[in-house]
């Protein structure tokens, strides 16, 4: 049986992240949206977050192992938030101001550093406002999801730190 601490953090956050990932794929399929390079990167980071949380649930590690998994999950969430924030910013820029005029299909054979440069330079397909719900675009929803997932991981890290400080303080008395 898994410790209660793992069930209360990693399993629910895994479900939240998995739901967000499935929703992104379902929206793409239902609305016929073509994902740009930033969308694909956000989904990869979200999938990484899901895998980290799922691994933490399956491993059932002690407090130190949980902390490492939470740090890794926080890294994926912050990376996803950075990519989503960049995507939101690019959607506010005029298409003529984008540096990269080449779509993702043409970038596949290039080196990783060139691909990374073009990832953050932007492409015309990253600028398109193709869908919104409650006046928020899909990258804005992704940004909110990544911030929420980062808050979950950070909360777990801070709670573990507070627990360690309190137990250390009680041992000294």
Predicted regions: what is each one?
Residues 1-48:
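Transmembrane alpha-helical insertion/packing segments
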Residues 27-30, 59-63, 90-97, 155-166:
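Juxtamembrane transmembrane-helix termini
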Residues 91-137:
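Extracytosolic (periplasmic/ER-lumenal) interhelical loops and adjacent juxtamembrane/interface segments
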Residues 3-15, 61-83, 151:
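Interfacial segments of alpha-helical transmembrane regions
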Residues 19-28, 79-94, 112:
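C-terminal TM-helix exit segments that contain a strictly Trp-centered aromatic cap at the helix terminus
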Residues 32-79, 172:
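Alpha-helical transmembrane segments and their immediate interhelical/interface regions
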Residues 120-173:
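A hydrophobic membrane-anchoring alpha-helix module
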Residues 1-8, 34-40, 61-68, 130-137:
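Juxtamembrane loop-transmembrane helix junctions in multi-pass integral membrane proteins
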């Amino acid at each position: 049986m898994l410790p209660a601490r793992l069930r209360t953090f990693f399993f629910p956050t895994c479900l939240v992240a998995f739901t967000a990932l499935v929703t992104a794929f379902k929206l793409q399929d239902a609305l016929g949206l073509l994902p740009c390079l930033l969308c694909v990167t956000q989904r990869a980071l979200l999938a990484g977050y899901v895998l980290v949380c799922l691994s933490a649930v399956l491993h059932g590690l002690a407090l130190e192992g949980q902390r490492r998994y939470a740090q890794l999950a926080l890294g994926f969430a912050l990376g996803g938030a950075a990519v989503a924030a960049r995507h939101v910013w690019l959607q506010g820029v005029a298409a003529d101001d984008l540096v990269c005029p080449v779509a993702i299909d043409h970038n596949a054979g290039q080196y990783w550093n060139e691909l990374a440069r073009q990832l953050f330079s932007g492409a015309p397909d990253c600028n398109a406002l193709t869908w919104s719900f409650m006046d928020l675009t899909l990258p804005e929803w992704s940004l909110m999801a990544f911030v929420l997932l980062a808050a979950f991981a950070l909360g777990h890290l801070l709670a573990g730190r507070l627990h360690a400080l309190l137990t250390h303080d009680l041992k000294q008395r």
